[in-house]
A protein has these predicted regions:
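Non-catalytic, topology-defining segments of multipass membrane proteins
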Residues: 1-215
Length: 216
C-alpha cells in the first residue's frame, strides 16, 4: 500500500494562492489606517494593546520556533500536540500555510542568493533599478511569484506530508485566518460588552498585529 509520503503532492492552485495572499497583505494595511483613525480619537484601550502584544509574541514564536526551526530545519523533536500548537500559531501570522512556508524556506537555504532563491534581493539585475526591484521582490513581491513553487514543493515537502498533524493544520489554513481575527474580536467583545469594542480589539490585536509581523 502506498504511503502518504510516497504520493505526489496536490497541484498548487496558484490563482487561489494569489487571491489569498493579496487579501492577507492588503487587509492588515487597511487595519492600520483604521487604527490610526481610532488612535487619533483616543479609541485604544489597555485590552487592545495587551492583545496586540500577546498575539504578536505568540505568532512570532509560531513562525520562528515552529515554521522555521521545527518544520523547515527539523532542529528539534517534540510531541504531536506541540507540533500542532506551533503550526497553528504560525498560521495565525498570516504568512501562508505551514507546508508551503517550510518548502519555500528550504528552497531559500538550498539556493541562497543565487538563481532559484525565492526571495533573494540580489537576483533582479544590476544598477539602481535592479536594487529597487530586488528590494521589493525580497520584501513582498515574492509572495505573488509562482516561479518554481510546484517544483520546490515536490522536492521539499515529503517529510511534512508524512506528518498527519502538519497535514491537518495546513489543510485548515482558512480556519486559522478566521480565528486569528475572531479571537481578538471575541475577547474585546467579552471585556467591553459591545460589538464596536470587539471590532477595536480585532483591529489592534488582529490587523495591526499582522501588519507589524509582516513588515517588522
Amino acid at each position: 500500500m502506498e504511503s502518504v509520503s510516497d504520493q505526489a503532492p496536490p497541484a498548487p492552485n496558484f490563482l487561489l494562492r494569489r487571491i489569498v495572499t493579496a487579501i492577507g497583505v492588503s487587509i492588515p494595511m487597511i487595519g492600520v489606517l483604521i487604527a490610526l483613525g481610532l488612535f487619533w480619537g483616543v479609541a485604544v484601550r489597555p485590552v487592545d494593546l495587551a492583545l496586540l502584544f500577546v498575539f504578536y509574541t505568540l505568532t512570532g514564536v509560531g513562525i520562528s520556533v515552529g515554521y522555521h526551526r521545527l518544520f523547515t530545519h527539523r532542529a528539534f523533536e517534540t510531541s504531536a500536540p506541540m507540533r500542532g500548537a506551533l503550526a497553528i500559531l504560525g498560521s495565525f501570522a498570516l504568512e501562508g500555510g505551514v507546508i508551503g512556508w517550510a518548502c519555500e524556506h528550504r528552497k531559500h537555504h538550498a539556493y541562497s542568493d543565487v538563481e532559484g532563491d525565492p526571495h533573494s534581493p540580489h537576483v533582479s539585475g544590476p544598477g539602481f533599478k535592479g536594487k529597487v526591484k530586488g528590494l521589493w521582490h525580497a520584501h513582498m513581491g515574492w509572495f505573488f511569484s509562482t516561479k518554481g513553487v510546484a517544483e520546490s514543493e515536490l522536492r521539499f515537502r515529503r517529510d511534512l506530508d508524512a506528518d498527519p498533524v502538519v497535514r491537518r493544520v495546513d489543510r485548515l489554513y482558512f480556519l486559522w485566518i478566521l480565528l486569528t481575527l475572531g479571537i481578538p474580536f471575541a475577547i474585546g467583545y467579552a471585556v467591553g460588552g459591545t460589538l464596536w469594542l470587539g471590532f477595536e480589539a480585532m483591529v489592534w490585536g488582529g490587523l495591526v498585529r499582522i501588519f507589524l509581523g509582516h513588515h517588522i
